[in-house]
Swiss-Prot record:
Keyword field contains Ribonucleoprotein: yes
Name of the gene this protein is made from: rplW
Protein family membership: Belongs to the universal ribosomal protein uL23 family.
Protein name: Large ribosomal subunit protein uL23
Organism field: Pseudomonas syringae pv. tomato (strain ATCC BAA-871 / DC3000)
GO biological process terms, semicolon-separated: translation
Amino acid sequence: MNQERVFKVLLGPHVSEKATVLADKKGQFVFKVATDATKLEIKKAVESLFSVKVERVTTLNVLGKSKRTARGLGKRNDWKKAVISLQPGQDLDFSSSAE
């Protein structure tokens, strides 16, 4: 996988109450990813960007909500979420990768 694709696969961390509990208790981290990204691409992107070993990648497609607007019904965009499980002894630190 080329370097350009690595940066397009991971769109950013997904911060929610459930994602925080997963990170604290199980060592799993949640990312927003490109909708066309595969599990293998996500695994390689996380391993190359954060220098960690990934044990498992679980993905799910999140459907956008229907919202009412002044012009009728609208719909938010669908997006893809990936839950990354790291191998035992590994930890992912977002602050050190930004420096």
